[in-house]
UniProtKB/Swiss-Prot annotation:
Pfam family for this entry, one: UPF0181
Name the record gives this protein: UPF0181 protein HD_1137
Superkingdom of origin: Bacteria
Annotated HAMAP family: UPF0181
NCBIfam families referenced in this protein's UniProt entry, alphabetically: PRK05114.1
Family under the similarity heading: Belongs to the UPF0181 family.
Native source species: Haemophilus ducreyi (strain 35000HP / ATCC 700724)
Annotated signal sequence range: none
Amino acid sequence: MDKALLSLTHEQQQAAVEQIQQLMKQGISSGEAIQIVANRLRESHQRTNEQK
């Protein structure tokens, strides 16, 4: 499993759920919406680690 995604705070998890729901309202499938949000989280985590 992806440790970066396992360490999300409750607030970050809630924000991710809201992003997924918004994408699904736009007609994107749930699987694709989850993948999009997960990729965004990974990219954000990677950028944060590179700045350290």
